[in-house]
Amino acid sequence: MNIKQLGWNAHFESHFENYRGQDLVPARVIRVGGGFYTLLGADGEQTATLAGQLRHGSTQDALPAVGDWVGIDSPQEGGIRIHAILPRQTALKRATVSNRKGLVEKPGVPQVLAANVDIAIIVCGLNRDYNPRRIERYLTLVHESGAMPLIVLNKSDICPETQARRAEIESIAFGTPVLVTSAQCGDGLDELASHLKAGSTLVLIGSSGAGKSTLLNRLACAEHQQTSEISAAVGKGMHTTTHRELFPLPGGALVIDTPGLRELHLWGESEAGLASTFPEVIGFAAQCRFSDCQHDQEPDCGIRQALHDGTLDPARLESYLKQRAEIASATLQSELAAQVAQKRKRKTIPRQGKRWRREHGDGQ
């Protein structure tokens, strides 16, 4: 397989020059699980593990994620090893979520959902999944990643208010395309397929039951991902997709399917994404007399004036303030985690020195 068909471009070519003398070859991560990485490259599909320096010296967000390009060695007795991860063009990150016991395993460390994505397709069902405020959160995530957002309102066949809901989402999308589809009936799929360019990488993100895997199956004309029925009584989807995986489509595009996101906590470095999602709020805030205006009791507040005039939706302001507070909290967590890591490192270095002297003597 030609690696250009997998999204290889001049960016990755230039960064890989540093590794050509190390007898490494490039491959793309298509699946991650159990400490193993499934790769796709010129030699087809292969399975690899991390080389020691990557396994022990990388934070969670620096480990290979689905969509990453990596440098691997030739098959050895111990299997194929990943020795390098090429710099990402884009990365969808969220704050680390709690596990099933309700505990955050690595607070302050982001989780990479997908790497090197050109277009992030935000899929929202037109059933009980429909939630404009949640779509705003996804938009902040995608804007911050560097990928282009595309909103898909799926399941139009069961919604009598399709056009009204499309208009509502367009009013908060600020230029982001909004498509209406029915994965079951095939409506709107041609328009969606027009965004799938050969060599481009897209990711499907959204809640469980929004129809991501069904859309993928229709676009691929094959049952790539098993899909589950939705309970008509509660409108909730079963978590059919249990892992993130990249699929090459017949037309040449590459699509990453993801499990439904139980939690979508914003990462601390999301200020730019927040501004792109709420440009009208930022614009009104710029009209405040004071640069540090809290939009409460200060005189000449652009935000309060916009609320009074009816030119700013109170729900939009509330959503903006909630996201801003969450990002500030995540930033603080990240800073605290960095301080803890630095202290741990300072303690580790003397211990390593003592161990070396015990093993090799004091050099006298």
Swiss-Prot record:
Positions contributing to GTP binding: 154-157, 206-214
Required co-factors: Zn(2+)
Domain CP-type G residue range list: 101-264
Feature: compositional bias, Basic residues: 342-358
Pfam families: RsgA_GTPase
Entry's cofactor comment: Binds 1 zinc ion per subunit.
Signal peptide: none
InterPro entries: G_CP_dom (IPR030378), P-loop_NTPase (IPR027417), Ribosome_biogen_GTPase_RsgA (IPR004881), RsgA_GTPase_dom (IPR010914)
Top-level lineage group: Bacteria
Residue segments, region Disordered: 339-364
Keywords per UniProt: Cytoplasm, GTP-binding, Hydrolase, Metal-binding, Nucleotide-binding, Ribosome biogenesis, RNA-binding, rRNA-binding, Zinc
Any GO BP: ribosomal small subunit biogenesis
EC numbers on record: 3.6.1.-
Transmembrane segments: none
Cellular component per GO, a single term: cytoplasm
Protein residues bound to Zn(2+): 288, 293, 295, 301
CDD domains (UniProt xref): YjeQ_EngC
Keyword Transferase in record: no
Subunit details: Monomer. Associates with 30S ribosomal subunit, binds 16S rRNA.
Role of this protein: One of several proteins that assist in the late maturation steps of the functional core of the 30S ribosomal subunit. Helps release RbfA from mature subunits. May play a role in the assembly of ribosomal proteins into the subunit. Circularly permuted GTPase that catalyzes slow GTP hydrolysis, GTPase activity is stimulated by the 30S ribosomal subunit.
Name of this protein: Small ribosomal subunit biogenesis GTPase RsgA
UniProt organism field: Syntrophotalea carbinolica (strain DSM 2380 / NBRC 103641 / GraBd1) (Pelobacter carbinolicus)
Organism lineage: Bacteria, Pseudomonadati, Thermodesulfobacteriota, Desulfuromonadia, Desulfuromonadales
Gene designation: rsgA
